[in-house]
């Protein structure tokens, strides 16, 4: 498109525009006339560009340039002439082919630089001369380190170096006195420098998916933190006390090797999300969790918990409670769980439950309920009081029947009851008018209720691996629509007891 674009850029239509938007236009080459533009914003992302012409340096008014998602492998030194440039986006290109020009350091007004996803293994030290830089994204590259001189970027507010191969962070980061967000997740870090605790304005610290063996004891001095992500650092056995982090809203200590939760957790009254999943050495929750009254999400998946403390009933704002893959029995789930009246998602799968607590009937806000892969023998009648439920999964249990009250779940959309021992279904299930998917496979059903013929909204009805005679197997093999139509068509005769599965099969074959 180079030739046509050249003439267009010469025209008044583009030349005097403040914003030149050429995104997603399959452009593979920029003409020299690009330098004649008087725009403040030049948007060229999602094209097929390989090079940037040297005339780019003539854009005397440009403040924003977006070259993201091209195939650019070379930045001309003339880019250093763009004295007015404030934001430069070069993510998702191929800049590893040629070293990035050191002239990039001449961009004294640059506040935002994005070099992410370029397979870079080196960066020019001259970036440290971009003294106005507030946002620097060098994530998703192949960096083992970055220049120590980056510590001179005193105005930096956001630094993203995630998805690289960093083995350490330099102590020079203490110069980032204005830093608010630091993301160094998905690297090879074993330790953090103590100087990280000097970043007094830091609100978000993400060091997840590393190889951290130890954390600075002074972590609790970072009182501005609102989001602390330590997840998936398998060697980490100890998290220092966090009692001073009174503004913390999100804490993830997932997949560590801790045997107890950090001291002072109960003092973090602003916490909204607490992720403690996949800590198999952790066997109990401290009772002071009761003070976390603002908590909305509590993830305890994959621990060795045998008891839920009564104090969990104080978490009245909780919306999601994940207790999957623990060792809970019905005797160790307190009745106080019924106080969680704002709970929208309750997950109890992969435990040792033989029954469900009847107190779940109090959870009127519940939308999603899972208790699959337990040893449940019955569903409490009270389940029918959860009229707002949209998804239920009780697969992989020992259920032999479904209570008639199940038909009251008028908002239910997905119902998974596979791999049980259900031999009969209640006729009230025609009340599941909102249901789009029902899985009853791998049970002991011989007949489906005729009322299923009224569930016209069903797109998936799986009744495979049941000894069904009504409907007959040839109908079942044809799928959901055929099953629903067959039940509807034969309902009248079937209710009179004049229809057998074999007889209908023969009628359909004629």
UniProtKB/Swiss-Prot annotation:
One Gene Ontology cellular component annotation held by this UniProt entry: cytoplasm
Localization of this protein: Cytoplasm
Cytoplasm in keyword set: yes
Ranges of the LRR repeats in the UniProt entry: 14-34, 35-59, 60-82, 84-106, 107-130, 132-152, 153-176, 177-200, 202-222, 224-245, 246-270, 272-292, 293-315, 316-340, 341-363, 365-386, 387-408, 410-432, 433-458, 460-478
Disruption phenotype: Loss of function mutant is defective in the regulation of F-actin organization.
Record has Cytoplasm as a keyword: yes
Any one Pfam family match given in the protein's UniProt record, by short name: LRR_14
Keyword tags: Cytoplasm, Leucine-rich repeat, Repeat
GO biological process: aggregation involved in sorocarp development; cell-cell adhesion; cell-substrate adhesion; chemotaxis to cAMP; chemotaxis to folate; culmination involved in sorocarp development; establishment or maintenance of cell polarity; intracellular signal transduction
Listed Gene3D superfamilies: Ribonuclease Inhibitor (3.80.10.10)
InterPro entries xref list: Leu-rich_rpt, Leu-rich_rpt_4, Leu-rich_rpt_typical-subtyp, LRR_dom_sf, LRR_domain-containing, LRR_R13L4/SHOC2-like
Function (record text): Involved in cytoskeleton remodeling, which is needed for normal chemotactic aggregation and efficient cell sorting during multicellular morphogenesis.
Protein's recorded name: Leucine-rich repeat protein lrrA
Lineage of source species: Eukaryota, Amoebozoa, Evosea, Eumycetozoa, Dictyostelia
Gene: lrrA
